């Protein structure tokens, strides 16, 4: 279950203008908000005290005292970082802090919500696959390419596609034993959802790395739920790629461990093959 800070963050777009001001003051500095009186919070948000009370009730709380209690509990549970949108008047210190804080918050949120049992089932799909196709579009396309770079090392037939037409053609000739790993921040990209349905109709399995409850999640055989609240109205997605890449690192580690120690010489040979391509370290410089 989401703590209060996570609930506020996830519902920002649902709040009316006045209540959103309250939410933004809380998210900007939750530690300070726990010390505010209702009058101080209303003043900081430039709203009335009744607006603060309505904000509390919209989150199922009886009033402001309960909000302060739940806010303190959220901070005590380790939710010290919450995402903050980059503003047009932010200076280098502010936007640097926000980007790092947003990334930390997203990684922490994803870690808490990932079910180890689902991770284990995802590793099963990867190990058992006859061939694996990594699909992504937009910002997720580079993540799909990185996955191909990781997973070819396991003696698996892998490919990565960022072209919609290629994705459809490959899905149209899928077979039982094929695995399609479809990566999408929103899970609402029509082309990717259609490809997932097409692959499953032809007997393949689909592993979705996407938002829970999204059309892509529903179209997938198995979904790794990746909660990624971020400001995408003006600025390009920032934290989504980091979380997706980290989840793929988790899956790659799971596959490596399943392969066992006998597989380590194979991985070592791949790594050692790159040694001649690098200049030696010059300890004097």
Swiss-Prot record:
Residues 2-78 form the HTH rpiR-type domain. GO terms for molecular function: carbohydrate derivative binding; DNA binding; DNA-binding transcription factor activity. Pfam families: HTH_6, SIS. Residues 38-57 bind DNA. Residues 122-261 form the SIS domain. SUPFAM superfamilies: Homeodomain-like, SIS domain. One of its GO terms (biological process) is carbohydrate derivative metabolic process. Keywords: DNA-binding, Repressor, Transcription, Transcription regulation. NCBIfam families: PRK11302.1. Involved in regulation of glucose metabolism. Transcriptional repressor of the gap-1 gene and of the edd-glk-gltR-2 and zwf-pgl-eda operons. Acts by binding directly to an inverted pseudopalindromic sequence in the promoter region. This is HTH-type transcriptional regulator HexR.
